[in-house]
Amino acid sequence: MKLIRRWGLMNSLMPENVAEHSAQVAQIAHALALIKNKKFCGELNADRIATMALYHETSEVLTGDLPTPIKYYNSEIRSSYKDIEQKANDSLLAMLPEEFREDYGRVINVDPESYEHMLIKAADKIAAYIKCVEETRIGNKEFSKAKQTLKREIDSYRKHEEVEWFCATYLDSFSLTLDELD
């Protein structure tokens, strides 16, 4: 994962790889689950969600990082790419010793209708937005449109109280330098 660069169609001043992105998504997903549990009486397994998030891009080991405009160009491409991702995950799981396949399968193949999946998707969008914030903060205007698009996508997740709380409490701090943090 560390060899797979993200944002392939963008001139990134701070390159990011899939391993770095996955770690940040896991941290954010873990935070969202903890917020749900501590602030809003949730009963989520935050550690399991963090682990699922850590592996959310596993298929990219074989597929690479397909740029978002291509992946979401139309429903037919999106559906076909979902199939490719599943085949890649299945191939990777088949490479494992038999006794590990079920355990890894449970964290790699997350039910797309589950609350956990939604939280990981929200965390994924937040992490991508943070990347855009970082790039635009240092003057890279190439990330401006992606930043606006991701902000709108995050807003659609704000109906979930833990996402709203995370965004209201933490999101603005990602645009600050270390010296600006209080």
Range-by-range predicted roles:
Residues 1-182:
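Alpha-helical, largely C-terminal catalytic domains
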